[in-house]
């Protein structure tokens, strides 16, 4: 199914490997406000080892993006860190979404240890205001984003739900308001936001952050907020995500 979705959307999946184990399943429950709770049945992604990684592909990409779900299991952790280090060493922009799912971790301390480990390799990070205290030991947006910047993260984006997105770039901070939305389901909103940001950064050339000014970054985040709002207005995850034409038409 996932390979079919990639094909239908014109995504190159030449690096995709098929394992004997089943695909991990996420069982998502949605309450009356559109907020979610998760249960997981883990599968093939937990078995990925460094030898499975196409290092040349990672080092020749414009952007490498990963999330913290692949840091929850031993061998997959090794593969994830190996790939991020290879890309970082080659000068590839490394993007990180430390999406905290308590059900996937033994303890919060374990999550903190492994979710913060890749930060020195990361150029761009997207996290929620709920995840900020876990990674930085403060809920203050200015101070928390400053602590991430001190660890080497160039662009920090903190999603605030209906309050929009807080950003730190080159020592400057600003907030982009959210679009008013009748929320059906928030599932996939963060992934849509990050995908939209990376799409716009990728269009900037071989060095996506080079020469990026605050005004352009603000416009990129407006675009991403709009994309996420469209996802929230629909039920589901992948089926709820808008096309590029839909986002541009809604701005």
Per-region residue spans from a language model:
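Short gly/ser/thr-rich secondary-structure transition/capping motifs
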Residues: 43-51, 104-110, 138, 209-210
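Conserved phosphate-binding/catalytic region of the ribokinase-like
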Residues: 85-86, 137-251
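Acidic, amphipathic alpha-helical patches
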Residues: 53-54, 115, 144, 183
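Glycine-rich phosphate/pyrophosphate-binding beta-alpha loops
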Residues: 23-24, 68-72, 228, 234-237
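Short, hinge-like loop/turn segments at secondary-structure boundaries
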Residues: 4-8, 31-34, 111-115, 143-145, ...
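Conserved N-terminal subdomain of the carbohydrate kinase-like
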Residues: 1-68, 248-251
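Short glycine/serine/threonine/alanine-rich loop segments
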Residues: 11, 92, 237
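Conserved beta-alpha-beta core of the PfkB/ribokinase-like small-molecule kinase fold
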Residues: 69-147, 154-155, 162-165
């Amino acid at each position: 199914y996932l390979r079919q979705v990639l094909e239908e959307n014109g995504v190159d999946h030449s690096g995709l490997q098929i394992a004997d184990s089943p695909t991990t399943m996420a069982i998502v429950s949605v309450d009356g406000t559109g907020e979610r709770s998760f249960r997981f049945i883990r599968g093939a992604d937990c078995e990925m080892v460094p030898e499975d990684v196409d290092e040349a592909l990672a080092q020749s990409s414009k952007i490498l993006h990963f999330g913290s779900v692949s840091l929850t299991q031993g061998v997959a952790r090794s593969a994830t860190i190996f790939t991020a280090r290879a890309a970082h060493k080659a000068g590839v922009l490394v993007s990180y979404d430390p999406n905290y799912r308590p059900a996937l971790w033994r303890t919060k301390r374990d999550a903190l240890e492994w979710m913060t480990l890749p930060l020195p390799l990361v150029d761009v990070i997207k996290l929620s205001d709920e995840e900020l205290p876990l990674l930085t030991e403060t809920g203050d947006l200015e101070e928390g984003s400053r602590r991430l910047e001190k660890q080497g993260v160039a662009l920090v984006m903190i999603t605030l739900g209906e309050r929009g997105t807080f950003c730190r770039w080159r020592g400057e901070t600003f907030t982009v308001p959210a679009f008013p939305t009748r929320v059906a389901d928030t599932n996939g909103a963060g992934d849509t936001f990050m995908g939209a940001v990376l799409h716009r950064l990728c269009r900037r050339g071989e060095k996506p952050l080079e020469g990026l000014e605050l005004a352009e970054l603000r416009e990129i985040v407006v675009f991403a907020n709009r994309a996420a709002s469209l996802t929230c207005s629909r039920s589901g995850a992948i089926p709820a995500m808008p096309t590029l034409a839909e986002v541009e038409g809604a701005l």
